[in-house]
Amino acid sequence: MLYIFNSFDNMWVDFIEQTKSFKVSVNNYFYYLNKIKKLFTYLNDLRKHILKKYVYTINHKRIAINYLYFSMVTGLSGAALATMIRMELAHPESPFFKGDSLRYLQVVTAHGLIMVFFVVVPILFGGFANFLIPYHVGSKDVAYPRLNSIGFWIQPCGYILLAKIGFLRPQFWRYYDKTSFSFPFLEKMKYNQYKEYKNDYLFYLDFLKKEITDDHSFFWKARKVIKLPQYSVFSFVPLKLMMWKTMINYPESFWYAASRVVQSRRKKVFVTKCSARTLTTAGWTFITPFSSNIKYTGVGSQDILILSVVFAGISTTISFTNLLITRRTLAMPGMRHRRVLMPFVTISIFLTLRMLATITPVLGAAVIMMAFDRHWQTTFFEYAYGGDPILSQHLFWFFGHPEVYVLIIPTFGFINMIVPHNNTRRVASKHHMIWAIYVMAYMGYLVWGHHMYLVGLDHRSRTMYSTITIMISMPATIKVVNWTLSLVNGALKVDLPFLFSMSFLLLFLVAGFTGMWLSHVSLNVSMHDTFYVVAHFHIMLSGAAITGIFSGFYYYFNALFGIKFSRMFGYMHLIYYSGGQWVAFVPQFYLGFSGMPRRIHDYPVVFMGWHSMSTAGHFITLIGIMFFFLMIFDSHIERRAATSSTLGLPRWYKRISYYIFKIRYLQHNKAKMNGIPGSTVRLMLIDRHFAEFEVFKK
């Protein structure tokens, strides 16, 4: 009996313990369930916060920072394409592309267009212009904030199309590259036999079936027979569901079908042995007839390229229209005609915005005419039917050469802000500096022909373009001399923006001198198609323009993000990036003197030494870019507060005059701005030593 009671007691104890453990497990379950619920609530709130802060925002400062982040991403993709190019050229016998010269040309095309249209332009006119102009003209925001947001979100559309050109394999586009960052957008449709049945019997697109196709040469005589394995089939789906999927997954099918329908009226078959239909080999300059004729370039890729440039042009047009209207309608009373109150960087940006307003429609008209020539059988650039292929080069370079000044003149503004800040004295002859950039910009409209010495221009045109190109060195010389004089007799404070400015000055001098040599017709004829030209414009754009942008970025870093930048990573960025530029592009001058042609993926072994050095310089530059992103991450993680110490006691005696200068300079500016009727003054912090007073309406 005792045994039974003990057993019952043990069973009861076990039951109580199991109940307790069950309660504990239930409590733990609800505890972790509550934690998961809080986590999902936090993630949902974070998603709403990110959408509200970055996607739905119409604030000019946030949109400007979005432009900067976007340009960082596109810059990395452009650098990846440049790495492919340098790895191909590091050694003869085509080590990277395995002899595929067309693929090499496609990568070069995408690299050039990404760097010009989706890196430098968004940084300057989407980032800095959107952030600074409302401050400097005295408005609370731009004239059309929602239009400003639309202009930003058009940029990624064009970039995705262009990245699709650069990061895909040379096969037909139904086979996408899984190593590409864009592969989620390129998932191919599943094979459907029923759709193929309807495609064959309802639409009877027999020329899109898998079959052997004759290849015709330029003389309309069959030379050989090529096989097109697994040729893509036009999928039959409803129109509303078909359009986006077709352009993303099967662009060659869509454009090839449309072009063949029109071309059949002229009884021509545009199939060639020159290039694969999905490759863009016309280059970033849209050389005709390669870009205007399906006979020479990709059936779908060149059209996607044209559409990408149109998207970039629409975004740029929205930006410069919005900012120019802001300047015209929202500027302070008295500010509109008193240029002396406006900072130099804003004067430079407004000048280049007006330049963009005149040259962007020209490029848009040129690429639209190319699209018409390709698909609607117009003959703007078709010589056999009365067109002029040289006209497209005139249109492109009328845009292309002023575009160089559009990219370099805003960096002049950054230098003119940094030099007086670091040297405790104003810029030498500010009015001459302003007139110099105006003369440089207006003369830039007259020299586009020096890119076309080899197309058959007569000697009078060559002489005119050469003379004006030489004359354009005078305003550039005025600027360099005034910057040098601004450094004399001052209490110089050497910091990171100032060192980037000096690096910019050296790179700009070398790029300008080498450009002046190219202005001479006799030298240009022998050097035009060599690596000398590649070195010249890369030192001007990748060297001078990007270095000037970095100087402005570090100068306005505290104003942009409200924190101080990491000095250690910043100085490493300066050393490696500037050093890498010299090591990468100076050897290319010697390659040009030796006769190494550009746009060629292979070369004799005699050029391997200079090419290897140039490739090493490229990787040194990539290390500098790595330090730049480390600086961004470290600055945002540490979040050191940007505090003003303008009135602090200086450590060194030579800084006494520096602080006195800044105090007097700020007091002078504040007195001038308070004199404008209907205005008040606010403070925009630049760095821990310096700030600017800006005006805005009451």
Swiss-Prot record:
Protein localization: Mitochondrion inner membrane
Pathway participation: Energy metabolism; oxidative phosphorylation
Alphabetized InterPro entries for the sequence = Cyt_c_oxase-like_su1_dom, Cyt_c_oxase-like_su1_sf, Cyt_C_Oxase_1, Cyt_c_Oxase_su1_BS
Show the stretches that span the lipid bilayer: 65-85, 113-133, 147-167, 304-324, 349-369, 395-415, 434-454, 468-488, 498-518, 533-553, 574-594, 613-633
* Membrane topology label: Multi-pass membrane protein
Residue positions annotated to bind Mg(2+) are: 528-529
Cofactor dependence = heme; Cu cation
Q: Could you tell me which CDD domains the record lists for this protein?
A: Heme_Cu_Oxidase_I
Annotated Ca(2+) binding sites: 88
The GO terms describing molecular function are:
cytochrome-c oxidase activity; heme binding; metal ion binding
Q: How is the cofactor bound?
A: Binds 2 heme A groups non-covalently per subunit. Binds a copper B center.
Tell me the enzyme class: translocase
Task: List residues binding Fe(II)-heme a.
Answer: 111, 538
Please list the reactions this protein catalyses: 4 Fe(II)-[cytochrome c] + O2 + 8 H(+)(in) = 4 Fe(III)-[cytochrome c] + 2 H2O + 4 H(+)(out)
A Pfam family (short name) is COX1
Q: Which GO terms describe its biological process?
A: electron transport coupled proton transport; mitochondrial electron transport, cytochrome c to oxygen
- Top-rank taxon: Eukaryota
Q: Which residues bind heme a3?
A: 536
Keywords in alphabetical order: Calcium, Copper, Electron transport, Heme, Iron, Magnesium, Membrane, Metal-binding, Mitochondrion, Mitochondrion inner membrane, Respiratory chain, Translocase, Transmembrane, Transmembrane helix, Transport
**GO CC entries:** mitochondrial inner membrane
Which family does the similarity line name? Answer: Belongs to the heme-copper respiratory oxidase family.
**Quaternary context:** Component of the cytochrome c oxidase (complex IV, CIV), a multisubunit enzyme composed of a catalytic core of 3 subunits and several supernumerary subunits. The complex exists as a monomer or a dimer and forms supercomplexes (SCs) in the inner mitochondrial membrane with ubiquinol-cytochrome c oxidoreductase (cytochrome b-c1 complex, complex III, CIII).
Q: What does this protein do?
A: Component of the cytochrome c oxidase, the last enzyme in the mitochondrial electron transport chain which drives oxidative phosphorylation. The respiratory chain contains 3 multisubunit complexes succinate dehydrogenase (complex II, CII), ubiquinol-cytochrome c oxidoreductase (cytochrome b-c1 complex, complex III, CIII) and cytochrome c oxidase (complex IV, CIV), that cooperate to transfer electrons derived from NADH and succinate to molecular oxygen, creating an electrochemical gradient over the inner membrane that drives transmembrane transport and the ATP synthase.
**UniProt name for this protein:** Cytochrome c oxidase subunit 1
What is the species listed in this Swiss-Prot or TrEMBL entry?
A: Tetrahymena pyriformis
